[in-house]
């Protein structure tokens, strides 16, 4: 079981704050006509990975369900906090979970690494449940940790009720929030390696990746597909070309691969990253900060 660290205590405080905020906030997804209107929309955003510079967006602040792209947050917490080489016994509650599955068996031994790859390559809902229990002791406690981590990342219009993305009226995000979560995840070396893997042969399981972008888009680096009837087709993608990496989110988009490719194409065709040496950076009050650092800015090509 995950032992609370100083960051864990911070997450607990964030979770309590989230509960207070939810008592006074009603996102578009959760209100009668507003909810129906939101669910009929698609949303998208594209951002440069490191700076968060927005390249394109549409309905990026509309609250929507996100299906299995939820697992980006689940995986991030596992990558940050768990020993991937630890061998565990599959918890009973992870056997026979609804939806996509890696077909875990009662009493089965498996390491956390194979569960993580099963989560992100095969979208196993049973794997998500097992990892939640391994990390936090229970699914409910894990969702508290997910919500706290979302707040730490500035995803204030996001709320998780489960680690897999199964439909629930109180389980939602926005394209902007999900992009912030994905950008943080893609800067974690372990996460990045997992979602960029096409085929995995582990100690206990072998998987192929469902994400077609890895096979069909030049420079693709990740990250996660998702689908439920309620959420529609959802995809978080990332790709790198010419020293620039872009992350895109599309929610409730029938042609999720085509839309993601179009967002990436637009970004690479119209923007570039400039890395500028910054010898003297001053803060308010005249205090010198970070001499010799490099400044990273996103520029429109030809500007």
Set out the residue ranges of the language-model regions.
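Domain-terminus/edge residues, biased toward the C-terminal soluble/receptor-binding domains
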Residues: 155-159, 167-303
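Active-site-adjacent loops and short helices of periplasmic peptidoglycan-processing enzymes
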Residues: 28-176, 183-187
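Gram-positive cell-envelope targeting signals
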Residues: 1-35
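Hydrophobic alpha-helical transmembrane segments of integral membrane proteins
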Residues: 11-12, 68, 219
